[in-house]
Amino acid sequence: VIVVAAAAGGVGGLVTQLALARGATVIGIAGPSNAEYLRSLGAIPVSYGEGLEQRIREAAPSPVTAFVDCFGGYASLAHSLGVPGERVGTLVPTPAIALRRARFTGGRDGKIADIATVAGLIDRGTVSLTIAGTYPFELEQVRAAYSELMSGHVRGKIVITIP
């Protein structure tokens, strides 16, 4: 069982789909408004907030063995669930992550082969990319896109179109 924090976001949604494509059971942490979306992907939705650890334990059909934090701040939760540091990945490095020996899994040094693999999964319909909104490359529109992003409740990716 893999837990994905921010599972309905752009990166979290892809992580969720990739894990499911590899046969994992995924518990996705997201807001209540995204529960049906996560179910449609094949994940088990769990709402964030008070009592999160207990809700994850109740939803998990077997012990949690990995944790991917696409939001930041969930290192202690992963630890409380018994996930070893080397089985925790995050996009947001913090001192707590370093202390628990978790992996920082972001960066610009992707591999061409990884891109080809994901592109193949998208072509076959195994993975889909959710677009939260599309904005033209104009100052006010870019500001609007940024405001939407900073709201913290974007499902999928925001696209800026350049003519």
Identify the meaning behind each predicted range.
Residues 1-163:
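Terminal helix/beta-alpha structural elements that buttress the NAD(P)+-binding lobe
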